[in-house]
């Protein structure tokens, strides 16, 4: 039997099939736009494999290359690109500068399903992270997201001095009602972050080790990691004091710049979340591409971070407000409703017998759930 499909390494095919069939659940007849940004870490060989798997499913791939957005969140997406997305059933977005912000209205109004793909390079798409079984990930997300909905309160503590407690808002928006991401309208891959939980009435201290690289370089902060943590004091859900080494003064500038756009809301503790994978990794020195480092590291279970500003102030189908500052608190212990759910950056659920039994169908749970170092 002959085939017109080119030969791909089995690990690459497994990763792409896991992505598009198991996680995104693309169906025969779907019109699928594969969106790529020129000059980003997108391997055309991986794109070709994704398109081949889409054809294998019986769907129609349409590969589109466009320019990076130099101003990121603050720049509009090309109307040509938006038109292509608006006529698709699914957009497979090989992530770089374009975000959900630029297409949220298309997702909500035209029901375009978005697949946010971080595995756009060969090393990531062939990794155990990209080949992680969806059945195991679904179990994890259902369990933790149910806890997040039902908990009511949270507390985040760390050995370096973070200790902050607050309430979890019960408000659920259209794009975060599902208990799992697979098959949904906004799927992140490989296993990515838990959806952000909105904070209320928080009080305490955060020790912050990094922020978004694209924000850091605007004011002269280290793009990857601060030399000295910045201490934020929070009262009634607002940052009221910023202190630390030389980084503290520059970090304060981010709040001041943001306040020019959204006022006092700049200091508001909007929400928080972490990655959901112990196997997330960065296949290069972070200094090579700090933005991509942040995109990938964001998905690790130890990468716990707060959004400070106006991220969750959304209404209806309008594009979300994107004015927020990232505050990364590494390897914390997190309690939901008094129950320990993360311990020093590692999810406690990995020890549950039922989850381990499911995982044993695919491999050794001790290997699958072992945290890969991402911050040393």
Please provide the spans of the model-predicted regions.
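Active-site bordering "gate/hinge" segments
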Residues: 1-229, 235, 268, 336-340, ...
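A conserved acidic, glycine/proline-rich C-terminal tail/linker
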Residues: 295, 304-325
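Short conserved micro-motifs at the rims of enzyme active sites and ligand-binding pockets
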Residues: 218-219, 244-245, 283-286, 317-319, ...
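Dual-mode signal for accessory low-complexity, basic/Gly-rich regions
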Residues: 225-226, 241-242, 246-309, 363-374
């Amino acid at each position: 039997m002959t085939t017109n499909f080119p030969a791909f390494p089995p690990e690459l095919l497994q990763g792409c099939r896991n992505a598009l069939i198991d996680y995104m659940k693309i169906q025969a007849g779907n019109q699928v736009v594969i969106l790529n940004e020129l000059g980003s870490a997108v391997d055309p060989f991986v794109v070709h494999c994704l398109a081949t798997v889409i054809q294998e499913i019986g769907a129609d791939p349409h590969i589109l290359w466009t320019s990076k957005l130099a101003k990121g969140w603050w720049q509009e997406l090309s109307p040509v690109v938006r038109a292509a997305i608006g006529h698709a059933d699914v957009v497979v977005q090989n992530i770089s500068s374009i975000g959900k912000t630029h297409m949220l209205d298309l997702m909500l109004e035209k029901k375009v399903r978005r697949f946010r793909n971080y595995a756009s390079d060969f090393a990531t798409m062939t990794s155990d992270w990209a080949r992680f079984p969806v059945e195991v990930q679904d179990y994890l997300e259902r369990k933790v997201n149910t806890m997040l909905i039902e908990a009511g309160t949270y507390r985040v503590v760390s050995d370096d001095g973070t200790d902050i407690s607050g309430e979890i808002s019960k408000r659920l928006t259209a794009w975060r009602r599902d208990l799992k991401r697979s098959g949904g309208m906004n799927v992140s891959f490989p296993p990515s972050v838990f959806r952000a939980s909105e904070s209320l009435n928080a009080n305490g201290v955060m020790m912050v080790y990094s922020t978004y690289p694209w924000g850091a370089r605007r004011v002269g902060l280290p793009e990857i990691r601060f030399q000295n943590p910045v201490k934020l004091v929070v009262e009634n859900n607002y940052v009221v004091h910023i202190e630390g080494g030389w980084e503290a003064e520059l970090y304060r500038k981010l709040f001041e710049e943001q306040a020019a756009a959204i006022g006092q809301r700049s200091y508001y503790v909007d929400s928080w979340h972490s990655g959901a994978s112990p196997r997330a990794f960065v296949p290069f020195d972070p200094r090579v591409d700090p933005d991509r480092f942040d995109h990938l590291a964001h998905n690790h279970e130890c990468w716990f971070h707060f959004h400070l500003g106006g991220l969750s102030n959304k209404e209806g189908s309008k594009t979300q407000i994107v004015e927020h500052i990232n505050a990364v608190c590494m390897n914390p212990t997190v309690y939901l409703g008094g129950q320990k759910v993360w311990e020093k950056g590692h999810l406690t659920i990995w020890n549950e017998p039922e989850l381990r039994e499911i995982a044993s169908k695919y491999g050794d749970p001790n290997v699958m759930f072992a945290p890969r170092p991402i911050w040393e």
